[in-house]
Amino acid sequence: MAKIDDLKAKSDDQLAVELGEMKREQFNLRFQSATGQLEKPARVREVRRTIAQIKTLQAERQRSATK
């Protein structure tokens, strides 16, 4: 799981790329879970939280840019 400080240091474009990668990984993990091939169930939670952190950072930056 990415540290929040590491995510804050990234640019908006880098965050967008990271979000895409996390969503892709979440999709793959969901399929692995459905087929019973998931080796690390905790990874699902980590990915979900990282996605939430990225979206929160993007929303904060958007709000501060409009002020």
From Swiss-Prot:
This is Large ribosomal subunit protein uL29. Signal peptide: none annotated. InterPro entries: Ribosomal_protein_uL29, Ribosomal_uL29, Ribosomal_uL29_CS, Ribosomal_uL29_sf. It comes from Zymomonas mobilis subsp. mobilis (strain ATCC 31821 / ZM4 / CP4). Gene3D superfamilies: 1.10.287.310. Belongs to the universal ribosomal protein uL29 family. It holds the Pfam family Ribosomal_L29. PANTHER family: 60S RIBOSOMAL PROTEIN L35/50S RIBOSOMAL PROTEIN L29, LARGE RIBOSOMAL SUBUNIT PROTEIN UL29C. One of its GO terms (molecular function) is structural constituent of ribosome. One of its GO terms (biological process) is translation. Keywords: Ribonucleoprotein, Ribosomal protein. GO terms for cellular component: cytosolic large ribosomal subunit.
